[in-house]
Amino acid sequence: NKLFEQGILKQQEFSVPVVVVGNIAMGGTGKTPHVEYIVEALMEKYNIGVLSRGYKRSTKGFVLASQQSRPEDIGDESYQIYRKFGPEITVAVCEKRVDGINRMLEINPKINLILLDDAFQHRYVKPSVSIVLTEHNRPVFKDSLLPYGRLRESRGALNRADIVIVTKCPPDMKPMQYRIFEENLNLFPFQKLYFSRYNYGHLVPVFPDAVENVPSFDSLDPGTPLLVVTGVANPKPFVRYLRRRKAKVKLKRFGDHHNFSSSDMVEIEKE
């Protein structure tokens, strides 16, 4: 960071706006849902390109998402984004973001907005706007640097952000709670602070032909037993959501971005 701030290491600036969505804590703040939210809000006005590293993919270098892409090729997050928005936007992965942006613009010169997923620490790209996420239940001002805590860099890194979003907020936040975040984050006047929360969608059957009536979350009877299988960094907000609906939740937790195997399926069936 010091080398970039002193101009010893150079940042690449691009002719199109580049919006960075990231965090300063390890995993679980909701970067990909917020990227999808931005895509949905802006895709009618812009030709959008989304670029990420492609976490846990088996490939290397630049890979452009296509109908033939698998999660193993481009990472599960990029795969999810492409499945949702498909050919209406350009999705690619590349470890070197400068190279990735250049390749995307070569392939599709109509792109006039780039979204970088999880690139706040990748400073070789000069962002037009930097958006940093911090989780409501574990905000940066209550966290510590690795390895004691989860912070990738110090709280002072927030000074580079244009926008800070407190994610996964409860639906019943009180005005005083908003004020606590404002005071503890202590942002500069030029920085904007927002708060977001999840609205969980409807249940989608894994095997549609085997299910006649898909229940909704709201239709769950008190005490309904649910086996919840997760492969995300922090499943607690979702589990709390289900328990508020009086469901009897049994959690089967796998690691973030877990690649499910046949033996996992056998283990789940035993539950």
Locate each region found by the language model.
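Walker A (P-loop) phosphate-binding motif
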Residues: 5-67, 170-172
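A generic structural signal for alpha->beta connector loops
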Residues: 15, 45, 88-89, 110, ...
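C-terminal accessory "lid"/substrate-recognition subdomains
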Residues: 139-271
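Rossmann-fold NAD(P)-dependent oxidoreductase module
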Residues: 37, 41, 117, 241
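Conserved beta-strand elements of the Class I
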Residues: 49-51, 132, 225-229
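N-terminal leader/targeting and accessory segments in enzymes
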Residues: 1-16, 262-270
